[in-house]
């Protein structure tokens, strides 16, 4: 015969298992696009890391302008095979390091934990430095070649005027972009 204590324990276990399944499903479905050159786990890692490299402020962040999709397309299209291999292995390594340090995939960690891990990767002596430099390079290229990156983050003028060489930045303000 089942007593009340055993019934409550069973309900708690069932509810815990269901809620765990829902949270892992929600994390797995967080992408709003279908990666073609990356695995879904790698795409989520790129999505989280790119947003840390170029976060949303008064200008759109990397995620909002489609940088993760840009990186996915770059890997599938014009990236050198050695670069693509370095990036894919680096993303897998980043996830493995995140799981070893915090018990969760990189995309599921807190922003502070993600920042701390990427700061370690940015160290000159870190073996992951080449991977992180490539990730930052692709992120900034993708960001500043997007419409929002070129027109909102930078000032856009199709014909910015006459050419004056070395001008103090105070005089002209932010950099200019042409697309």
Model-inferred region functions:
Residues 1-15:
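N-terminal secretory signal peptides and thylakoid transit peptides that target proteins
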Residues 56:
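Extracytoplasmic/periplasmic solute-binding protein
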């Amino acid at each position: 015969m089942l007593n009340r204590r055993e019934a409550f324990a069973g309900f708690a276990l069932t509810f815990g298992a269901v809620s765990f399944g829902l949270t892992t499903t929600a994390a797995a479905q967080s992408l709003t696009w279908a990666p073609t050159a990356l695995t879904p786990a790698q795409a989520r890692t790129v999505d989280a890391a790119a947003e840390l490299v170029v976060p949303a402020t008064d200008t759109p962040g990397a995620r909002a302008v489609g940088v993760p999709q840009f990186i996915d397309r770059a890997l599938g299209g014009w990236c050198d095979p050695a670069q693509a291999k370095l990036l894919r292995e680096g993303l897998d390594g980043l996830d493995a390091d995140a799981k070893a340090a915090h018990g969760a995939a990189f995309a599921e960690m807190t922003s502070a934990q993600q920042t701390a891990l990427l700061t370690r990767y940015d160290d000159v002596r870190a073996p992951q430095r080449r991977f992180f430099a490539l990730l930052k390079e692709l992120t900034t290229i993708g960001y500043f070649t997007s419409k929002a990156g070129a027109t909102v983050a930078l000032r856009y003028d199709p014909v910015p005027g006459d050419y004056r060489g070395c001008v103090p930045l105070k005089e002209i303000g932010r950099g200019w972009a042409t697309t």
